[in-house]
Amino acid sequence: MTELPDNTRWQLWIVAFGFFMQSLDTTIVNTALPSMAKSLGESPLHMHMVVVSYVLTVAVMLPASGWLADKIGVRNIFFAAIVLFTLGSLFCALSGTLNQLVLARVLQGVGGAMMVPVGRLTVMKIVPRAQYMAAMTFVTLPGQIGPLLGPALGGVLVEYASWHWIFLINIPVGIVGAMATFMLMPNYTIETRRFDLPGFLLLAIGMAVLTLALDGSKSMGISPWTLAGLAAGGAAAILLYLFHAKKNSGALFSLRLFRTPTFSLGLLGSFAGRIGSGMLPFMTPVFLQIGLGFSPFHAGLMMIPMVLGSMGMKRIVVQIVNRFGYRRVLVATTLGLALVSLLFMSVALLGWYYLLPLVLLLQGMVNSARFSSMNTLTLKDLPDTLASSGNSLLSMIMQLSMSIGVTIAGMLLGMFGQQHIGIDSSATHHVFMYTWLCMAVIIALPAIIFARVPNDTQQNMVISRRKRSL
């Protein structure tokens, strides 16, 4: 890093700030949801749409971000991403209704979807290959700090100012980042193939419509027949994409990816696994505040051990997988996460609050080991020619499954709470207990998929990926 020119180091700082903004926003909002609900005059049971709208938009826009950067230029797209993210933050802070806030989060999600992948692409273009690993470590470090600061910072801002400030703090950072990007970042472009617009639209429509159909009756009052039509339309869009990809060599995601067995298993397991684990960052601060009566600040502090456990586990997960193999690790961590989530609920309802940080630390460790194992299992055997496409598809599936997980969690709360829950009451405890029991089952189910993964540790090494060609 020290041998790099000054202008390159400044460019890396710009990318790092983009990573920080995007990652901070993934956790800072969750702590503020109950306060947002009170301010906007909404039931806390509807506030999951604030999270879903952002994450689903990121999932939809991710496939287009790399192509746009290659075609229009990394500086132009990164600048646009920061501007959109900052404008979205401003509109979020100015929102007076839930619908306005959801629309503003969609705009914010468009910027967030382009910020991280285009940032990675920028590093690839400005840094020599020999220093790429060090550069990526540098720019992703703020992305690891963001989720750690998010819950506590969100709690402080909500408790001592208002929820609007969790979005307003993005504005000065965004303005400085946009100006620095425009002045300092080169606008690299390359020749690229024609963008698969029909495939992109089919996938986008399918993902958005299916997610809407999953929760439309509770959040939007859509009739059952309309929901059935939406579900059928979303499924038809996905099937049409598969037909399109089979006939089109330039499809957004080639079906050749699924000729690699570990990719197919890993992708299916990642989708199912992240539906369950995606519920936890949303539900935990909501339960702490509404179910137990914690203040936003204390609820935010409680989330820090989970992030610390996640970061600490990343240092040893490679050795664990190499020692025990993917099947054992994935089955054990999947069932373990379900048990730890039940332990968290039991400890909380028994009033043993002093044990909650320890349980959340353990939850973060188990979840991190499972995430890392799922990611490497999915990508490790792909041919080099398909590695980039496979990584993009995995990133999209990760965001989609998390949005579905939050949607299901909100649906369960609404079903058991019947739209009426009070702060730290016996009835509320029962609502969250039933919700957590259902969540534990959903978290545990992917173990059935992971049980089919080969467990030969030599063939499933994390640190070396076989290079093959189709």
Swiss-Prot record:
Gene Ontology annotations for the cellular component aspect, listed alphabetically: plasma membrane
Keyword Cell inner membrane: yes
Alphabetical list of InterPro entries matching this protein: MFS, MFS_dom, MFS_trans_sf, Multi-R_MdtD
S-S bridge residues: none
Parts of the chain on the Periplasmic side: 1-11, 70-76, 125-137, 186-196, 246-262, 307-341, 417-430
Membrane topology per record: Multi-pass membrane protein
Keyword Transmembrane helix attributed: yes
Keywords: Cell inner membrane, Cell membrane, Membrane, Transmembrane, Transmembrane helix, Transport
Membrane-side (Cytoplasmic) residue stretches: 33-48, 98-101, 159-164, 218-224, 284-285, 363-395, 452-470
Cellular localisation: Cell inner membrane
Entry's Gene Ontology molecular function annotations: transmembrane transporter activity
Main location class: membrane
Transmembrane feature ranges: 12-32, 49-69, 77-97, 102-124, 138-158, 165-185, 197-217, 225-245, 263-283, 286-306, 342-362, 396-416, 431-451
Family: Belongs to the major facilitator superfamily. TCR/Tet family.
PANTHER family attached to this UniProt entry: BLR6921 PROTEIN (PTHR42718:SF46), MAJOR FACILITATOR SUPERFAMILY MULTIDRUG TRANSPORTER MFSC (PTHR42718)
Protein name, per record: Putative multidrug resistance protein MdtD
Gene: mdtD
